[in-house]
Amino acid sequence: IVGREVGNHYLPTRKSPIHTWHEENNAVFVAAGLWQRPRYYPRGSEDMNSAVNREAANVRKNVGICDVTTLGKIDIKGPDAPEFLNRVYTNAWLKLPVGKARYGVMLREDGMVFDDGTTSRLSENHFHMTTTTAQAANVLSHLEYYLQVVWPDLDVNVLSTTEQWSGI
């Protein structure tokens, strides 16, 4: 209707609950999807390489934390949840003990890596999956597709909880 007379577009930005802390500590941010994620923390006139090397040396000698709020988070529940994870990941999930987590790689149908992340077993049929920031929405769609079209007989529910959880 308006053609090229649309004006400025609104681009939503997601920030972690500790975004202000990152700003106060001079973080240089990078866009990660809709998220603003800290890339490094320069001191004075440090360039990125110097700041990253300083941070890495400090973590090796002391301790470090990382704001992982931007990672995708998916809640997976149902009696067939372990079997479902067995089918969508390259590694086994049936015997993962409750209270433990496992790193997993998810492939596309052509065998190329689609996404990776950790999945924790919260109870016998309840899992918490993390995805990469960039692929969070695509992984959720991928899981929903397989549950609705490929394996409709599996009794599993998936729900994005990305906006309900923060992580450090």
Regions found by a protein language model. Name each.
Residues I1-I168:
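Glycine/proline-enriched, intrinsically flexible loops and inter-domain linkers
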